[in-house]
Swiss-Prot record:
PANTHER family per record: SOLUTE CARRIER FAMILY 25
Pfam family, one: Mito_carr
Organism: Meyerozyma guilliermondii (strain ATCC 6260 / CBS 566 / DSM 6381 / JCM 1539 / NBRC 10279 / NRRL Y-324) (Yeast)
Entry's Gene Ontology cellular component terms: mitochondrial inner membrane
Highest rank taxon of the organism: Eukaryota
Gene3D superfamilies on file: Mitochondrial carrier domain
PROSITE patterns: SOLCAR (PS50920)
Transmembrane regions listed in the UniProt entry: 12-31, 83-99, 120-141, 167-191, 214-230, 265-282
Signal peptide positions on this chain: none
Protein name: Mitochondrial thiamine pyrophosphate carrier 1
GO biological processes: transmembrane transport
Main location per the UniProt record: mitochondrion
Annotated membrane topology: Multi-pass membrane protein
Function noted in UniProt: Mitochondrial transporter that mediates uptake of thiamine pyrophosphate (ThPP) into mitochondria.
């Protein structure tokens, strides 16, 4: 009989900070490498203010990028994105492990006991917010580089200078407010649904290969469906040179593009995010189990 794989994200699990740092970094880098072209297309769709159907918008965007900018254009913004994914993966999983241990100690000290799914929701949200603070400037740089529709590539240095000229160093955090809601909530929901999926599928783990990947796919798809409108607001705000209120921007999108405007790029985002979560969580578990 096969030896059960350890779930390193479960409540009370123990793993060294070094191991979670390495595993989180590797999982982030691999996930980004797999989904980079999808991310570029998603960003272009989210920034479009044209009223196109989902299918037409996706097809036209892919064709336009390939025809006007070349195949390499699908990896525009990849350098800051790789840095962001590595840092985000390392910070997210490391802080998740640390917050999980701390919360477990609080439960023991004060005599209360959270359900594993609620434990994961609290810890996952905290880990997501921590990761956001560390990586957000790279997310903004990634968005601006990927949005460049010219055939030539902009450099990170040039974009940083543009941002500093218009908004100072604080400009690197333009759009952070909806991101606080989006990424924090998304991370919490992802870990929460992942643990629920793990509990439900526990009886099949010896018979179904890559069960962590299936659970991660479900977790990523569920969390993204709830938080995607906030992600669209974030992308729009990242491209602006002046401060814009979340409510004001949301009203503008609703008035000009309708409710669909908040979900532009959602289809490809789902294609991208679910595999990203699946690859990230699966690689994380594989690396830790191999260390």
């Amino acid at each position: 009989m096969a030896t059960p794989r350890e779930d390193h994200l479960k409540k009370g699990a123990t793993a060294s900070v070094y191991h979670t740092l390495v595993a989180g970094s590797v999982s982030g880098a691999v996930a980004r490498a797999v989904t980079a072209p999808l991310d570029t297309v998603k960003i272009r769709l989210q920034l479009s203010n044209k009223s196109l159907g989902a299918h037409d918008g996706l097809r036209q965007t892919v064709v336009r990028i390939f025809k006007n900018e070349g195949i390499r254009a699908f990896w525009k913004g990849n350098v800051p994105a790789e840095i962001m994914y590595i840092l985000y993966g390392a910070t997210q999983f490391t802080s998740y492990s640390m917050f999980s241990k701390a919360l477990t100690e609080l439960e023991t000290t004060y005599g209360f006991n959270l359900r594993p799914s609620n434990h994961s929701l609290i810890v996952g949200t905290s880990a997501g917010l921590t990761s956001l603070i560390v990586t957000y400037p790279f997310d903004l740089l990634r968005t601006r580089l990927a949005a460049n529709s010219e055939r030539h590539f902009l450099s990170m240095t040039a974009v940083i200078k543009q941002v500093r000229a218009s908004g100072g160093l604080a400009g690197l955090y333009m759009g952070a407010k909806p991101t606080l809601l989006s990424l924090g909530l998304n991370s919490g929901l992802m870990f929460w649904t992942y643990e629920i999926a793990r509990e439900v599928s526990a009886q099949y783990k010896d018979n179904i290969p890559f069960i962590e990947g299936f659970c991660g796919f479900f977790a990523g798809a569920s969390s993204k469906g709830i938080t995607f409108p906030l992600d669209t607001l974030r992308k729009r705000m990242q491209m602006r040179s002046s401060k814009t209120s979340i409510i004001g921007l949301a009203r503008t999108i609703l008035r000009r593009e309708g409710l669909f405007g908040f979900y532009k790029g959602f289809g490809i985002s789902l294609i991208k995010t679910a595999p990203t979560s699946a690859v990230s969580l699966f690689v994380y578990e594989v690396v830790l189990n191999g260390m």
